[in-house]
């Protein structure tokens, strides 16, 4: 899937539509587990790199997660520009990374343990 190249101020409609985009140090992607179908997919919006997810939509549980950790001025602006304007569940950045990488199961299952 090709990412739309947009300006940061045009990010919100892409986020609300769950469309991948690339802006200036603000971008999104669909993440899914290898060898699984789209039921395990997550739509992740990042500021700068994968170490700072701002918002995550988890398809499996139909929930938006929001990074509740402290960040700088530019990342704060990225968050405002990409906010989906819907109910979100706030998480610490470490938990956001777990959800981005493993879905909500990353919050409840230790790494290496599968159901």
Q: Where are the language model's segments positioned?
A:
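Terminal leader/tail segments of proteins
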Residues: 1-115
């Amino acid at each position: 899937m090709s990412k739309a190249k947009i300006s940061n101020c045009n990010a919100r409609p892409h986020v609300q539509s769950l469309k991948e985009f690339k802006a200036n140090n603000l971008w999104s992607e669909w993440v899914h587990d290898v060898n699984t179908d789209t039921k395990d997919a997550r739509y992740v919006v990042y500021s700068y790199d994968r170490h700072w997810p701002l918002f995550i939509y988890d398809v499996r549980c139909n929930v938006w997660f929001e990074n509740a950790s402290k960040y700088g001025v530019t990342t704060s602006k990225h968050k405002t520009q990409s906010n989906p304007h819907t109910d979100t569940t706030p998480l610490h950045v470490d938990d956001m990374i777990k959800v981005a990488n493993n879905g909500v199961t990353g919050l409840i299952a230790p790494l290496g343990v599968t159901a």
